[in-house]
Amino acid sequence: GSLTVTGNYKHAITSDDYVRFRSGCNITVVSAKKDGIHTNESVIIGGGILNISSDGDAIQCEEGGITMTGGFAKLSTTDNKAHGLKSCLDVVISGGAIQAQVAGAASKGISCDGNLTISGGKLTAFTSQTALYEDNDLSSCAGIKCDGNILITGGEIAIQSTGGAGKGINCDGSITINDGTVKVITTGTQCVYGKLDSSAKGIKADGALTINGGTVLVKA
């Protein structure tokens, strides 16, 4: 079935439990003052079509993870620090397609506090704004931002970041690429705020960056 929602005051769709999307569903969030979909537990996308436009995060899991095995999700956000997918735990993508376009400063296509695993599907992320100075730090836009480790064993990833100091993939842990296709383009200029500075980077890992296979193309 189909559902069209507008969040005039807060989140458009919210749940204290998990949210699951199956084949045949068609969910449209026309707009939301905060998050498009906000859940305290996990989000499971097994099929269907999600078209979400929000000021805040398009999909946020406050205390859970995100799993995607199929379907299509088109995610658009406008606020600063608003993300396409935001998970406080792991994100696992094995199928389906995600198209994330985030317009605010310091926004991310995917923001993952845990580990990110991609074994299939297609991810496209576009960021266009500059870095944001906050709490004595510069926070940049990124197609993917992961606090844990990233493992890519398949799928197609295409990221374009045009804003100042934008990152394609930004990982606090280690990145391992065994297969799949990863294409990253970053064109932003360097951002300087006092003694702080940040430059555009295609792929950045604070831990090890290991490429065992697949195709990796970076223009930065």
Annotate each predicted stretch with a short phrase.
Residues 1-220:
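A composition-driven surface/loop motif
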